[in-house]
UniProtKB/Swiss-Prot annotation:
Main localization (coarse): cytoplasm
Domain of life of the organism encoding this protein: Eukaryota
Subcellular location: Cytoplasm
Organism expressing this protein natively: Medicago sativa
Limits of the sHSP domain: 44-158
Subunit structure: Forms oligomeric structures.
Keyword annotations: Cytoplasm, Stress response
Protein name: 18.2 kDa class I heat shock protein
Amino acid sequence: MSLIPSFFGGRRSNVFDPFSLDVWDPFKDFPFNNSALSASFPRENSAFVSTRVDWKETPEAHVFKADLPGMKKEEVKVEIEDDRVLQISGERSVEKEDKNDQWHRLERSSGKFMRRFRLPENAKMDQVKAAMENGVLTVTVPKEEVKKPEVKTIDISG
């Protein structure tokens, strides 16, 4: 193990190719690298597996927003299960390789993703809507109106 960084080394480095120079990682050769984590989540899927989703509640609805850059609506599936579970899933395919192509970087994520959310009792399951614009999926789940308790005035006798 060398303590001197190899700025021009690495799997995809070429001294004469300005796009292939890897950023030096001082912990790369240490025994505590994330090899166990890397084995369970391959690098090409790691970012996609953890698709970010925001969930906010307004007075009228529960609103979910998922960042899905570069995906088309045909590649995404939104489902509601009987037990009030909202499921957002999809798959981004790996770009087809041409034997004449030379890759300098391969950093964009690919693979499948799935996120599940248990919806509260007040969710109107039959009125869920989804829209996708500029790589952001928005799922709107309307809420049932909360009934105000009836107040009955009682006459006081005596």
